[in-house]
Amino acid sequence: MNDSSTELVHTEDCGQVSINISKPGITKGQHWHNSKWELFIVVAGHGLIQERNINTGKMVEFEVSGGKIEAIHMIPGWTHNIINLSDTENLVTVMTCNEVFNPEKPDTFFEPV
């Protein structure tokens, strides 16, 4: 199976929920938002979430795994990524976003952490 992202829920009022599968060693993200916020919940595998404030440079990291379910908040103005730290297992992450993607007003800006 290739890396994948599948939208599970899509509502104009409450945003969207998707499931994301990352192969071993893969980094995803490397972007930030003006108004969107997201929650990343790793349900299987072992990964690292990195966030960096685009104005101050302050950086935070969260080691995450399916063995310890927790929600990590991606806040506006912080570029973020998620890295699969495993050499053998997929990283499975439930991702929620408070807004749906609007192609006429995109709110995703590439910037490495």
Stretch-by-stretch model annotation:
Residues 35-36, 68, 78-79:
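A generic "binding-loop/recognition-motif" signal
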Residues 29-31, 49-51, 71-74, 80-87:
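Short beta-strand His + acidic residue motifs that chelate non-heme Fe in jelly-roll/DSBH
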Residues 56-58, 62, 79, 83-113:
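Double-stranded beta-helix
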Residues 35-53:
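Glycine- and acidic-residue-biased ligand/ion/polar-headgroup-sensing regions
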Residues 7-8, 28-34, 41, 62-64, ...:
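Short histidine-centered beta-strand/loop micro-motifs
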Residues 1-16, 27:
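A short, N-terminal "cap"/entry segment at the start of jelly-roll beta-barrel domains
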Residues 53-76:
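Short acidic-glycine-tyrosine-enriched beta hairpin
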Residues 18-36:
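Conserved short histidine dyad/triad with adjacent acidic residue
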